[in-house]
């Protein structure tokens, strides 16, 4: 074996020389240089400094401006809540542990950190699934009389939490487990061992099928149909120019969110899948650390995309920050905001 397995950890380093120690008790400087741990800490600090204000501001601005409380925005706000879970429940602890060179909070802290990181990532993924379905129903109109309303949005939010908990909670109940990963300063689901005592193999298969592959299939199907429908409608001029423009802008925003999600999470999922299907193979701690920490940047891109591509939200945010006056001169009362007929989201 090219790694060292303990009762509640797996260190990707052979203990042939006897240097491996528990990542809950000793610094892991035999895995990497101390400066590399410091770089990880600096990166986590950057994500906290950027991630908390922008996600909190997204929630605060929506509470302050009633016009932003539209059904589709409920799902987008759900993304902000998920990102805050990741920032507060995961990033802060990882910053602290990186500074110490090992996971100082012990197995219980590892469970909590892994739970919040998994929960936030899964809420984001299933929120994108709900957004894809909403775009498909609104634009492709498989149900001609359907209107995406507040009740549908609330059910969509509830669905994302149920599915996220169905992925994040089982390791706390004994189906699989959370262990330190990479440089042993952050925790995630155990992809490294089969661990029959906790039926780890069945859980990892379940997670990859139900909580990654199926959502991706739904998302790609919905947007494949959507692109075809938008092109067909444009060719036949079935909708008014204003409605077409608004629907295209909202669709473009959501598609960019999906692409950003894939850029952040597919490398992590791919490496995790490789590790799981190549048990005992030779790989270093950096092999998993880089995609794991890169995936954490997902906490800042959704609100950035939303702010950049949604003029109505951008104006409301500037008005809130600048104490009631928009410095760009777009007065809220007089600004013309095009809303789609069904989803009521302003185009950029």
Swiss-Prot record:
Name used for this protein in its record: Rhodopsin
Resulting phenotype, residue 347 to L: In RP4; common variant
Sites annotated Plays an important role in the conformation switch to the active conformation: 113
Ranges where the record places region Interaction with SAG: 330-348
Superkingdom of this protein's organism: Eukaryota
CDD domains: 7tmA_MWS_opsin
Keywords: Acetylation, Cell projection, Chromophore, Congenital stationary night blindness, Disease variant, Disulfide bond, G-protein coupled receptor, Glycoprotein, Lipoprotein, Membrane, Metal-binding, Palmitate, Phosphoprotein, Photoreceptor protein, Receptor, Retinal protein, Retinitis pigmentosa, Sensory transduction, Transducer, Transmembrane, Transmembrane helix, Vision, Zinc
SUPFAM superfamilies: Family A G protein-coupled receptor-like
Residue ranges, Cytoplasmic side: 62-73, 134-152, 225-252, 310-348
Modified residues (N6-(retinylidene)lysine): 296
Annotated glycosylation sites: 2, 15
Molecular-function GO terms, alphabetical: 11-cis retinal binding; G protein-coupled photoreceptor activity; G protein-coupled receptor activity; metal ion binding
Transmembrane domains' residue ranges: 37-61, 74-96, 111-133, 153-173, 203-224, 253-274, 285-309
Modified residues (N-acetylmethionine): 1
Cell compartment(s), UniProt: Membrane; Cell projection, Cilium, Photoreceptor outer segment
Gene: RHO
Principal cellular location given in the protein's record: membrane
